Design a protein with these regions (language model features):
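Solvent-exposed interaction surfaces and binding hotspots enriched for charged
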Residues: 1-87
Length: 87
């Protein structure tokens, strides 16, 4: 879960704002590749090249996927069901 204390978030805010600002200037066709590059580069820099750490990194990516779906996609889908009706 990405729930870190508010005080710990402050150290990331400025750099994240700058990164998001740069990504928002890209065309939709380029965002995915550049975001993939950024995340891959971060993971390669912080995790040593050992199976244990590769496994941890893949686990982090899986949890990011699940959290994004739970917090963003699922509420969106729920609203669309209300708007258009269920299948």
């Amino acid at each position: 879960m990405p729930y870190i204390k508010a005080g710990n978030r402050k150290k990331y805010e400025k750099i994240l704002e700058e990164l998001v600002k740069i990504l928002k200037t890209l065309s939709p066709e380029k965002i995915d590749g550049e975001l993939n590059y950024i995340v891959t580069k971060i993971l390669k820099e912080i995790y040593p090249l050992r199976y244990f750490h590769i496994n941890k990194a893949v686990g982090v990516l899986e949890c990011i996927k699940l959290e994004y779906y739970r917090r963003v996609a699922a509420p969106y889908e729920d609203q669309k069901i209300k708007d258009a009706g269920d299948v």
